[in-house]
């Protein structure tokens, strides 16, 4: 399958190029979208990809787009994909309502998977969080997420996804149960998220379930960002023969 990398100059984009250089499970890098000069040496690739700032040409040259860009960038990409539908795997977070609506429109034309986190470990953390939220009915739930000092969105998309999982298990009103700036006493049907930014932390998420006299903490730490690139490539392979629909990462991992 021919892969197009959108957001190739970013942290995960560079890791995607590195994985594809070795021909990851038969995937071929066919196009790379860049706004400025790309520093990657493509001579090591078995097939020279199209490196372009022409979005339409970039989309036409591939069968699947893997996106790790910025919200505005993804919005522009979706406009191009609506004209020329291709499989989409996106890990871009912090999206506006309009962008999410365009994603739903694309899902009528092509298979896509949008996830705040592409790692198997986070998928498992979500499942454990749902179970703990359901069983520990009297526990107060708090989420702490830590990332590098260059991350732009806070709370992280992964933390918000974990919040949604816990709120759904409890039957809370998802729009009103979230607390990100706590003042005064804690309300019972609330879930807090604290965001920490510093250094070069790839990502750490901890969910605490606090009871009287004891507490449980479930935690996931990313020690290497390559897990996100490999997860996205696995998603591309998984989507290859799927029908048009917006898929969830939990479906991919069974």
Curated annotation (Swiss-Prot):
Binding residues for NADP(+): 35
Catalysed reaction per UniProt?
Answer: (S)-2,3,4,5-tetrahydrodipicolinate + NAD(+) + H2O = (2S,4S)-4-hydroxy-2,3,4,5-tetrahydrodipicolinate + NADH + H(+); (S)-2,3,4,5-tetrahydrodipicolinate + NADP(+) + H2O = (2S,4S)-4-hydroxy-2,3,4,5-tetrahydrodipicolinate + NADPH + H(+)
Domain of life of the native organism: Bacteria
Q: Keyword Amino-acid biosynthesis, does the record have it? A: yes
User: Active site annotated at which positions?
Assistant: 147, 151
Which stretch is the leader sequence? none
The UniProt record gives the binding positions of NAD(+) as 7-12, 91-93, 115-118
**Record-listed (S)-2,3,4,5-tetrahydrodipicolinate binding positions:** 148, 157-158
Q: In which pathway does it act?
A: Amino-acid biosynthesis; L-lysine biosynthesis via DAP pathway; (S)-tetrahydrodipicolinate from L-aspartate: step 4/4
Q: Which GO terms describe its cellular component?
A: cytosol
Q: Identify the EC number(s).
A: 1.17.1.8
Biological process (GO) annotations?
A: diaminopimelate biosynthetic process; lysine biosynthetic process via diaminopimelate
InterPro entries found in the cross-reference section: DapB_C, DapB_N, DapB_N_CS, DHDPR_bac, NAD(P)-bd_dom_sf
Q: Which residues form a coiled coil?
A: none
- Pfam families attached here? DapB_C, DapB_N
Its localization reads: Cytoplasm
**Briefly, what is this protein's role?**
Catalyzes the conversion of 4-hydroxy-tetrahydrodipicolinate (HTPA) to tetrahydrodipicolinate.
Question: Which family would the database say this protein is a member of?
Answer: Belongs to the DapB family.
Query: What is the protein's name according to its record?
Result: 4-hydroxy-tetrahydrodipicolinate reductase
In its UniProt entry, the species of origin is given as Helicobacter pylori (strain P12)
What gene, per UniProt, encodes this protein? dapB
